């Protein structure tokens, strides 16, 4: 499965700025992975990784603004859409897909947003996919 997701926030803002500031790199070791590299990496995984029953579980221990999490959820949701037509089943499987993805970050604003350079955090970006 080769997927290129539409991540306008990531593509427009973060692709140009892989580093928010020298201070954040120094203090947090923070550097962002562009979505095209995320997709290249995820394309190396077998297709069964995207099934939702039983779901593969993913943990991103340095999730930043969620580029990996968004791409993983997008692939899982595409699998759901292509394997069931029933809206109620799709909804249940979409929630199962979301529940199988975990992200942690040292910086609360990466998760929650609210910084002038980072208004939308990983949490809201993930939830907007549903």
Q: What does each model-found stretch correspond to?
A:
Residues 1-130:
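SAM-dependent methyltransferase catalytic region
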């Amino acid at each position: 499965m080769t997927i290129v997701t539409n991540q306008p926030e990531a593509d427009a803002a973060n692709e140009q700025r892989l580093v928010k500031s020298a201070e954040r790199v120094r203090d947090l070791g923070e550097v962002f992975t562009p979505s095209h590299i995320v997709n290249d990496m995820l394309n190396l995984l077998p297709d069964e990784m995207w099934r939702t029953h039983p779901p593969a579980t993913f943990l991103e221990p340095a999730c930043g603004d969620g580029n990996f999490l968004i791409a993983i959820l997008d692939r899982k949701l595409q699998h759901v859409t292509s394997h069931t037509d029933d809206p109620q089943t799709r909804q249940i499987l979409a929630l199962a897909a979301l529940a199988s993805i975990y992200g942690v970050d040292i910086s609360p604003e990466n998760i929650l947003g609210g910084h002038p350079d980072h208004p939308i955090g990983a949490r809201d970006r993930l939830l907007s996919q549903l």
